[in-house]
Swiss-Prot record:
<comment type="function">
    <text>Contributes to the transparency and refractive index of the lens. May act as a chaperone, preventing aggregation of various proteins under a wide range of stress conditions.</text>
</comment>
<dbReference type="Pfam" id="PF00525">
    <property type="entry name" value="Crystallin"/>
</dbReference>
<comment type="similarity">
    <text>Belongs to the small heat shock protein (HSP20) family.</text>
</comment>
<dbReference type="GO" id="GO:0009408">
    <property type="term" value="P:response to heat"/>
</dbReference>
<dbReference type="Pfam" id="PF00011">
    <property type="entry name" value="HSP20"/>
</dbReference>
<dbReference type="GO" id="GO:0005737">
    <property type="term" value="C:cytoplasm"/>
</dbReference>
<dbReference type="InterPro" id="IPR002068">
    <property type="entry name" value="A-crystallin/Hsp20_dom"/>
</dbReference>
<feature type="binding site">
    <location>
        <position position="143"/>
    </location>
    <ligand>
        <name>Zn(2+) 3</name>
    </ligand>
</feature>
<feature type="domain" description="sHSP">
    <location>
        <begin position="41"/>
        <end position="149"/>
    </location>
</feature>
<dbReference type="InterPro" id="IPR008978">
    <property type="entry name" value="HSP20-like_chaperone"/>
</dbReference>
<dbReference type="GO" id="GO:0005634">
    <property type="term" value="C:nucleus"/>
</dbReference>
<dbReference type="GO" id="GO:0051082">
    <property type="term" value="F:unfolded protein binding"/>
</dbReference>
<keyword id="KW-0963">Cytoplasm</keyword>
<keyword id="KW-0862">Zinc</keyword>
<keyword id="KW-0539">Nucleus</keyword>
<dbReference type="GO" id="GO:0043066">
    <property type="term" value="P:negative regulation of apoptotic process"/>
</dbReference>
<feature type="binding site">
    <location>
        <position position="89"/>
    </location>
    <ligand>
        <name>Zn(2+) 1</name>
    </ligand>
</feature>
Length: 149
């Protein structure tokens, strides 16, 4: 449930690679909730670099907004029980000057996710979706290291 701009609606809500605005530098506009939560007065929640993790009985899913990165800028790997997502692009020009971006995310996979059946896709609007089916408790899920295309 969303509780407005004061409380993040998603655990990993972040504004990576967005740059600073003038109100970010003024102390009376800063968030009193937490020094790690950046409240935005001018951006919608849908443009905030959202990362959402879902886990139900059938599957485990990660959805990550990577709209500022091309597919060539992204790397997705499984190392043991972790998914590692890395994005980096070199300096390029935008409306406000030059900018370079980089992020690194690491998520622990549930033990019952079948790592051999994991898929990853990137939508046209920049949403990276990583999904893996869960196996019943009596079956063994495969583990190891492999890159996800």
């Amino acid at each position: 449930r969303a509780l407005g701009p004061l409380i993040p609606s998603r655990l990993f809500d972040q504004f990576f690679g967005e740059g600073l605005l003038e109100y970010d530098l003024l102390p009376w506009f800063s968030s009193t909730i937490s020094p790690y939560y950046r409240q935005s007065l001018f951006r919608s929640v849908l443009e905030s670099g959202i990362s959402e993790v879902r886990s139900d009985r059938e599957k485990f899913t990660i959805m990550l907004d990577v709209k500022h990165f091309s597919p060539e800028d992204l790397s997705v790997k499984i190392i043991d029980d972790f998914v590692e997502i890395h994005g980096k692009h070199s300096e390029r020009q935008d409306d406000h000057g030059y900018i370079s971006r980089e992020f690194h995310r690491r998520y622990r996979l549930p033990a019952n996710v079948d790592q051999a059946a994991i898929t990853c896709s990137l939508s046209n609007d920049g949403m990276l979706t990583f999904s893996g089916p869960k196996v019943p408790a009596n079956m063994d899920a495969s583990h190891g290291e492999r890159p996800i295309p």
